[in-house]
From Swiss-Prot:
GO terms for cellular component: plasma membrane. GO terms for biological process: electron transport chain; transmembrane transport. HAMAP family: RsxD_RnfD. Belongs to the NqrB/RnfD family. The complex is composed of six subunits: RnfA, RnfB, RnfC, RnfD, RnfE and RnfG. The gene is rnfD. It comes from the Bacteria. This is Na(+)-translocating ferredoxin:NAD(+) oxidoreductase complex subunit D. Pfam families: NQR2_RnfD_RnfE. The modification FMN phosphoryl threonine is found at residue 156.
């Protein structure tokens, strides 16, 4: 009889087709359509901002890990993803140093200070965006509208919608494709490109369908209830970017099915409340960050029951 070569080791025994590097590489592939649209419409400066954020993120991670005498793990591509997502959250008018400061904050403070990859309790790119918006609101709210034939500065569709100036709104098709005019940050101008990337991630099994689907449905239903166009709310601003690439962050979102549904509903509700009743026209970033903070509580109450285990009731004291 042939001898079997068996390896004895402690659990958990994980057999997965995806490594951390392959997951991050798939996310980058999914972001390429939106990056291509940004480069086509905005020009080389959009690509330069992305490169600045990526280089700053990777360099910061390497330096911090070196200082802490930890293994340098920049080859897992997670810092690259953070850099791209941060750049996608910047307006085209942002100076280069905004990208550098945001990248350092995202990696050094939000990620490495809490233990590194998988230990951050909020999304690093969104936390950096919130930090930059609070510190330099002028640079972070200067949004350009750039038709392919001219360049003009104007308000975003969400600002127009909030002000009730619906007559000045671009067409839904323009908002969906992002090709006939630019409204918003670098990576959020084309809902179509982001949708293609998001569907790719779902197809590859990188993200669950629950969070983006429930998030978008919540926004659509809320918009219908208040008499507004649900399509406009879904394809404008950072909703598509947030739904597929931000809210689905492994470290800061629930892992249970029930938890993901509650989390996504919360993201959608807070997004619409801020958009319609808050002082800022866009609520996507803050909604996801708030639900990131609520994730441990959500998981506590939605964790799966262990089969065969029952709670023992304590006897009442006499």
């Amino acid at each position: 009889m042939n001898e079997l070569n068996l390896t004895v080791s402690s659990s958990p025994h994980i057999r997965a087709k995806h490594s951390t590097a392959s997951i991050m590489q798939n996310v980058i592939i999914a972001l390429l359509p939106a990056l291509a649209v940004a480069g086509y419409v905005f020009g080389l400066w959009a690509l330069a901002l992305v490169a600045i954020c990526v280089i700053s993120s990777v360099a910061t991670e390497a330096v911090i890990q070196k200082l802490l005498k930890k293994p340098i793990t920049v080859n897992d591509w997670s810092a690259v993803v953070t850099g791209v997502l941060l750049a996608f959250n910047l307006p085209i008018n942002a100076p280069w140093w905004i990208g550098v400061v945001g990248s350092v904050f995202a990696i050094a403070i939000v990620k490495q200070c809490f233990g590194g990859l998988g230990q951050n309790f909020i999304n690093p790119a969104l936390a950096a965006r919130a930090f930059l918006l609070a510190s330099w609101p002028g640079h972070m709210t200067s949004t350009a509208y750039i038709p392919l034939t001219d360049t003009v500065t104007t308000a975003t569709p969400l600002a127009l919608l909030k002000a009730g100036e619906t007559g000045s709104m671009p067409s839904t098709l323009d908002l969906f494709t992002g090709l006939n005019g630019v409204y918003g940050c670098i990576g959020e101008i084309s809902a179509l490109a982001l949708l293609i990337g998001g569907l790719y991630l779902i197809y590859k099994g990188i993200i669950s369908w629950r969070i983006p689907t429930i998030y978008l449905l919540t926004i659509a239903i809320f918009a219908l209830l208040v008499g507004q166009d649900p399509i406009v709310h879904m394809v404008s601003g950072g909703v598509m970017l947030g739904a597929f690439f931000m809210a689905t962050d492994y470290a800061s979102s629930p892992v249970t099915a029930k938890g993901q549904i509650i989390y996504a509903i919360g993201c959608g509700l807070i997004t619409m409340i801020i958009r319609l009743y808050g002082g800022y026209p866009e609520g996507c970033s803050y909604s996801i960050l708030l639900m990131n903070v609520a994730t441990p509580l959500i998981e506590r109450f939605t964790k799966e029951r262990i089969y065969g285990v029952t709670k023992i009731k304590k006897e009442a004291k006499a």
